[in-house]
């Protein structure tokens, strides 16, 4: 039976960048300005009729089932929620994670066999069997003493066929932020392989693909490591750094390295910048495009900005070359990311806020394809998005989840 709880007033809660703990106290909702001329309004299939007792966090979707976490401290335990998303999202169940006051990240393995949930305060990685996708069964709770400050994000991915977890550990209790790499070949018995203190002041997120690991190091920029596919002898237990770049304004929150199956291009990675914000009201931060054609010397070449709103997480429909970005109070944004992004006319360049160097502006290049959820008539605050099978699923911190139709290429 679905578990439903009353939504406490949260529009005045300070997000302060939900992930960064910085603060903003702007009293009124920021007007989101859309200056582009051609993006379509993304159509909405439906909204999950559910208002949690706290704010909705990350979302992961597999088949017709979605999983969402709850963000915001609780004095006892938190739950993640399970949804039927075959049509309009419907809440079907929830799972309590004992002793976890906040749940941040959630991810499903590529084969659909397991689910991982990152817990903060106290930190751990909870791994569940998805033999029955809507009845997860706890397999293990990885919680060594040095991660108790909190696991903020947990990326899972394969390196040479073997599953690993990449955990971004919060600073706290006098300890600095850490990256922890875990062997998840046996999800019932995770094995720690590698730990390093890194990030300024956070290592916020990672992205793993083809034996390369991209790290979001907040004000230390983006680092690229060989962990089995970079040709420098790196492994998950002994990574080798290939290159690093600092993006405009820092605050590197998340990364997606694009591999376009149609063009064969793997030249660009997309970086989210998360500034300060207030839940349901305001946010700040751009999408930055870095050219990684030379992994030893990555460089920022383009950006996308929304006046009055900031980005959070991405999902990319790589087959069609479309990036979907969660944009907090700016809804969902769909961007054309196929082809050359770092070359443009002078008229297509702009100065990113905080920079004195003009870069290609994706909006001026006509790359904005769609905008979603600004037509709903209610405050929105989109934390995460996932593209899957022609639909875009969005976790909204103040409204539960939405299911939208994807956009088409022009």
Q: What residue ranges belong to the model's regions?
A:
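C-terminal motif of bacterial Sec signal peptides marking the signal peptidase cleavage site
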Residues: 16-18
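Feature marking well-ordered beta-strand scaffolds used for ligand recognition
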Residues: 21-410
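Bacterial N-terminal signal peptides that target proteins for export
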Residues: 1-9
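General helical structural elements
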Residues: 9-10, 337
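Residue-level signal for mature regions of secreted extracellular proteins and peptides
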Residues: 12-13, 353
């Amino acid at each position: 039976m679905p578990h439903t709880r009353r939504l406490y007033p949260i529009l005045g809660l300070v997000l302060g960048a939900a992930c960064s703990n910085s603060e903003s106290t702007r009293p009124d909702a920021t007007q989101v300005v859309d200056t582009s001329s051609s993006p379509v309004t993304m159509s909405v299939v439906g909204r999950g009729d559910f208002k949690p007792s706290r704010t909705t966090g990350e979302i992961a979707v597999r088949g017709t089932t979605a999983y969402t976490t709850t963000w915001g401290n609780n004095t006892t335990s938190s739950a993640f929620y399970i949804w039927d998303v075959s049509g309009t999202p419907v809440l079907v169940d929830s799972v309590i994670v004992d002793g976890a006051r906040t749940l941040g990240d959630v991810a499903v393995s590529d084969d659909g066999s397991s689910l991982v949930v990152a817990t903060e305060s106290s930190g751990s990685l909870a791994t569940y069997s998805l033999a029955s996708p809507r009845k997860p069964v706890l397999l293990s709770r990885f919680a060594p003493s040095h991660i108790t400050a909190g696991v903020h994000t947990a990326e899972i991915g394969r390196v040479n066929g073997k599953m690993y977890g990449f955990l971004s550990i919060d600073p706290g209790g006098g300890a600095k932020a850490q990256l922890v790499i875990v062997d998840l070949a046996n999800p019932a018995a995770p094995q720690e392989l590698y730990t390093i203190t890194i990030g300024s002041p956070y290592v916020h997120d990672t992205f793993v693909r083809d034996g390369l690991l991209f790290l979001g190091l907040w004000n230390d920029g983006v680092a690229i490591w060989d962990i089995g596919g970079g040709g420098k002898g790196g492994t998950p237990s002994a990574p080798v750094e290939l290159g690093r770049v600092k993006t405009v304004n820092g605050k590197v929150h998340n990364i997606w390295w694009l591999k376009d199956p149609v063009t064969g291009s793997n030249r660009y990675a997309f970086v989210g910048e998360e500034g300060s914000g207030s839940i349901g009201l305001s946010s700040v931060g751009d999408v930055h495009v870095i050219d990684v054609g030379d992994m030893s010397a990555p460089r920022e070449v383009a950006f996308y900005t929304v006046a009055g709103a900031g980005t959070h997480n991405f999902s990319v429909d790589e087959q069609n070359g479309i990036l979907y970005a969660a944009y907090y109070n700016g809804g969902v944004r769909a961007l054309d990311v196929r082809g050359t992004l770092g070359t443009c006319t002078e008229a297509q360049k702009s100065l990113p806020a905080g920079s004195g160097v003009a870069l290609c502006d994706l909006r001026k290049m006509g790359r904005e394809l769609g905008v979603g959820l600004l037509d709903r008539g209610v405050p929105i605050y989109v934390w995460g998005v996932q593209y899957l099978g022609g639909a875009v699923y969005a976790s909204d911190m103040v409204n539960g989840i939405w299911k939208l139709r994807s956009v088409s290429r022009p």
